[in-house]
Amino acid sequence: KSSRIEGTKTSIEEDMSDIEDISPEKRNDYIEVHNYIDALNQGIYRVTSGELPISSRLIKEIHSMLLKGVRGENKYPGEYRVSQNWIGGSMPSNAKHVPPPHFMLDELMSDLEKFMHNDDLKIPHLLKIAILHYQFETIHPFSDGNGRVGRLLIPL
C-alpha cells in the first residue's frame, strides 16, 4: 500500500512473478515495489540483529535501496539533499510546506535519532512512532523519496 500512495500500481500476481514476466511498461513499478520489500527486510534485519540501530546511517542505506534503478535514482540516493526543497507550489513562496534548509539536516536528523533512542520518555510507543514519522516528513531530508522512507520507518 505504501507504494500505491506514490502512484505505483502492481498486482499481487505481478509482485510474485519474475521480472522477465512483467510487461515493459510495468517494470518500473515492479522494481519500485521490490526495492521497498528489500529495503524493509534489510532494515528489519539490521535492527533486530543488533547490527545497526535506527540511525541516520540506516535511513540513508534504506533510501539508497529504495531509489536504486527507479524514479528518483538521479537525486542522490543515500545522501541528504544539498539544496532547498519544498512541497506543493512552483516555488517556496507559494509552497504548502518549506522544510528546513539543507545545512541544518545533520543537526536535525541527529536530534531525531536522540528522540528515537530516548528511553526516558514516558510516552506510548505508537505515539512516539507517530511523532517520529511527522518530524521526519517535516525535515524532508532527501531530494526525493522522503514519503517512501518515512513510511518504511514506521514498522522498524
Residue spans for each PLM region:
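FIC/Doc superfamily catalytic core
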Residues: 1-156
